[in-house]
């Protein structure tokens, strides 16, 4: 263990007793699931929403992009705030705002209004995602953190399995705004669960007290840290490949390959099972296999999926080639996310865990939001842009991670 890691480890809060750990896992897993819930439950409704609001595929995809941009921007605010104010207050404020924004989405009269509200919804929900990661870092480090992140992947992974299935079934009985009514209820439930079941993990004596200048200094130190930036970019590029699939596949699979909304939701759920399975394999291997090797394996799976997808689209293999490629792209995320996050946060003191978590989230969702519209640039009749974008991003993620493997870590200044 490095001196930095040892120093950071001495600042860890006491983990909850074994009997309370399942409650912590469920709450934090549900909080990190706000992103897939906000995005994936809505996916089967995209073509119908596009028709109802008389808008094109690119504008419809912007309702996804706006949510992702909000998720990135909100993390940049909520993470540093949680370093100064503690974890609970910013978390509860964000969840309350998320519920209100989701309710307003139900009555959005135009696609422009919906885009704006989705931006707010994403920014509010970001508090849950960034603070959940910071709480894990408050309590765990290194392989222990990687194992906990992988366990969260099990809970988090259920969201992309269930969300599109629930969304597809909802569309059988309600119009597309009904999806946002369900998201409103989820926001209220998470607010109450966090209020009653989540203790403060960053006591006043361990908080950042230097104000905005200290936060800016911590950001500069982290960005200049080759290991942190490299692993953060690897997470961001890999997620961008995944989000290109998320935003492009409703149109590609339903409009080009003729899948029904229900068939699409089932295929999406199967791919999400791959994320869960890979994440649990990573949890079993963490501590016995180096985290860098687990990350490399995940990135290799994502890159292989991108290659299969591109070949299938260019060669005209149809769903028999497209679906396996998308499955590999998704499954690899189960190894990439937990291990890259643990490597990036390893040895960082809890007083900057929120800021570090925010920077990782900004990279992840900003790159994802930028990549998403590329899937539809050539119009609704071709899957080539989606396949090319996914393959290129997967290769870039693997190259960045390989370049920083073994790089020394620095600690943000006081």
What are these regions (language model features)?
Residues 73-112:
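Conserved MFS/SLC helix-loop-helix module at the cytosolic interface between two early adjacent transmembrane helices
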Residues 10-18, 201-232:
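Juxtamembrane intracellular "pre-TM" segments in multi-pass secondary transporters
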Residues 185-206, 400-404:
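C-terminal membrane-cytosol helix-exit motif in multi-pass small-molecule transporters
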Residues 343-382, 390:
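A late C-terminal transmembrane helix in Major Facilitator Superfamily
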Residues 52-54, 86, 107-113, 124, ...:
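Helix-breaking motifs and short loop linkers at transmembrane-helix boundaries and internal kinks
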Residues 109, 113, 141-144, 150-196:
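Helix-loop-helix hairpin linking two adjacent transmembrane segments in secondary transporters
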Residues 117-158:
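Cytoplasmic helix-loop-helix junction between adjacent transmembrane helices
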Residues 97, 101-104, 112-121, 320-328:
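Paired small-residue
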């Amino acid at each position: 263990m490095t001196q930095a890691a040892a120093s950071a480890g001495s600042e860890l809060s006491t983990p909850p007793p074994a009997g309370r750990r399942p409650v912590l896992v469920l709450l934090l897993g549900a909080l990190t699931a706000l992103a897939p819930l906000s995005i994936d439950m809505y996916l089967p409704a995209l073509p119908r929403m596009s028709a109802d609001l008389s808008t094109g595929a690119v504008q419809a995809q912007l309702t996804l992009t706006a949510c992702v941009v909000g998720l990135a921007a909100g993390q940049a605010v909520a993470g540093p705030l949680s370093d100064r104010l503690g974890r609970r207050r910013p978390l509860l404020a964000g969840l309350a705002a998320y519920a209100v924004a989701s309710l307003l989405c139900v009555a959005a009269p135009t696609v422009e209004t919906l885009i704006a509200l989705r931006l707010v919804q994403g920014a509010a929900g970001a508090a849950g995602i960034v603070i959940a990661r910071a709480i894990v870092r408050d309590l765990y480090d290194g392989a222990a953190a990687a194992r906990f992140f992988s366990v969260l992947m099990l809970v988090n992974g259920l969201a992309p399995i269930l969300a599109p299935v629930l969304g597809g079934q909802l569309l059988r009985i309600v119009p597309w705004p009904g999806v946002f009514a369900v998201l409103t209820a989820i926001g209220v439930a998470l607010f109450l669960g966090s209020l009653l079941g989540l203790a403060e993990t960053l006591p006043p004596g361990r908080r950042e007290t230097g104000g905005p200048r200290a936060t800016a200094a911590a950001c500069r130190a982290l960005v200049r840290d080759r290991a942190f930036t490299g692993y953060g970019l690897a997470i961001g590029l890999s997620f961008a490949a995944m989000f290109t699939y998320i935003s492009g596949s409703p149109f590609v699979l339903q409009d080009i390959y003729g899948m029904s909304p229900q068939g699409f939701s089932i295929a999406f759920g199967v791919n999400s099972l791959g994320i869960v399975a890979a994440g649990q394999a990573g949890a079993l291997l963490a501590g016995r296999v180096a985290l860098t090797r687990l990350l490399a394996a995940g990135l290799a799976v994502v890159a292989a999926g991108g290659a299969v997808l591109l070949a299938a689209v260019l060669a005209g293999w149809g769903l028999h080639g497209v679906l396996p490629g998308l499955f590999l792209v998704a499954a690899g995320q189960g190894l990439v996310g937990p291990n890259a996050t643990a490597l990036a946060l390893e040895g960082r003191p809890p007083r900057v865990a929120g800021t570090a978590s925010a920077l990782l989230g900004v990279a992840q969702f900003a790159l994802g939001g930028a990549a998403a519209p590329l899937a539809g640039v050539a119009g609704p009749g071709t899957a080539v842009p989606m396949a090319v974008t996914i393959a290129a991003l997967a290769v870039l993620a693997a190259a960045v991670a390989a370049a920083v493997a073994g790089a020394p870590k620095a600690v943000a200044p006081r």
